[in-house]
Amino acid sequence: QHPRTRGARSIGRTLGQLHSIGARSRFQHRPRLTVAGHGEASRRFLLDNDFIPDELRPAYETLTRDLLARIAQVWRMCDNGPLLRLHGDCHAGNILWREGPLLVDFDDCLAGPAIQDLWMLLSGERAQRQAQLAELIDGYEMFYDFNPAELQLVEALRTLRLMHYSAWLARRWDDPAFPRAFPWFNTPRYWSEQILALREQLAALDEPTLRLF
């Protein structure tokens, strides 16, 4: 179930505990969440390996260039916070429930800002996301302090996730299992929808950020 319907505060407590432990030392062999690694490298791989259809390439190239420039601005504004050891892919599908929330699937763990483990738990209209955030942070701060400046990163992180996921699939496309498992990928329709989603993100980056009351 989504955290808005079940225990957002409890999930917040679990993540606060995770980050409190994660802040005690650093990863030695895991990646760091960066604009260069998740955004620029993803864009370059897709363009250099001709995944984008010719008729869509100019739009994708220009749009992603503008997005990454905008994201880099936002990133610099928030670049003075600690990098924590994170779950990295914390969404409702990676939370099991027993007596409380149980995080699973740590294969995407990496170093980055705390908000990376929180933003995917928010959904719905702005008022709903605001309420979910308040519940999450209320539980989170029982164990670890949250820097509200990181809320500026939410739409930047959403954009990087979109770009990184496309490149993740593309890098594995020579594996016969992937075209069978993801038949919708690497079609003109897929790339048209990606461009539309990225255009929406360019607008979202200029919208007011969520706030803690």
Question: How does the language model describe each region?
Answer:
Residues 60-74:
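Mechanochemical coupling/switch segment within NTP-driven translocation systems
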Residues 148-158:
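All-alpha amphipathic helical-bundle segments outside canonical DNA-binding/catalytic cores
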Residues 37-46, 141-147, 184-201:
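Short, mixed-charge aromatic SLiMs
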Residues 50-51, 167-213:
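ATP/Mg2+ or Mg2+-diphosphate-binding catalytic cores
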Residues 72-118:
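Active-site acidic catalytic loop and adjacent metal/ATP-binding pocket
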Residues 2-59, 81-83, 181-184:
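A cross-family kinase active-site recognition segment
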Residues 4, 8-12, 115, 129, ...:
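Short, charged, low-complexity patches
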Residues 114-146, 161-177:
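Active-site activation/catalytic loop segments of kinase-like enzymes and analogous catalytic loops
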